[in-house]
Amino acid sequence: MLSDGQPAPGRRGALSAAVAAAVAPLLARSAASTAQLLPAAALLCVLFTAALTDLETRRIPNRLTGAGLLVMIALTALFEPNFVAERLLFASLVFAFFLAAALVRPGGLGLGDVKLAAVIGAALGAASVIAVAFAFSIGALVGAAIALARGWRHARAVALPLAPFLAAGSALTLLFGG
């Protein structure tokens, strides 16, 4: 346990790195250069760690989202300096969209999800819109499957963590559409 009461993410981080390494050959096929591959792999590490943590604890640590945001901006500045302003803009826009959603319906969307969305915006820029659309589509399909399996009344009581869907949507965007 860490001082903030959250479990240490070491095991999840190692698993996330393994998943990112396994996905790297697929990313390499879709990435035009190392300048795209390294940030994509770093993003996947952050996203899969967040997804596993969210599934296990229903929380996304500030350390993870804060470090993820800094790493994404630093990698952009290093490899694609002309895109830093765009990435910061989309990090802000996606953050604002998710924050508005969290404020409209308190308890429906956690602030960890809001901050994780900013990491996605910083990493993907304009393609973050596609990633979020994929994430919500996948989440809607899973929600519909739960509703079919449990019945609508019981399905409404099920709270799904969003980070796994954000990770899946971003991975699909990296592999096929971003």
Name the predicted role of every residue range.
Residues M1-G178:
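A membrane-topology feature that recognizes alpha-helical transmembrane segments
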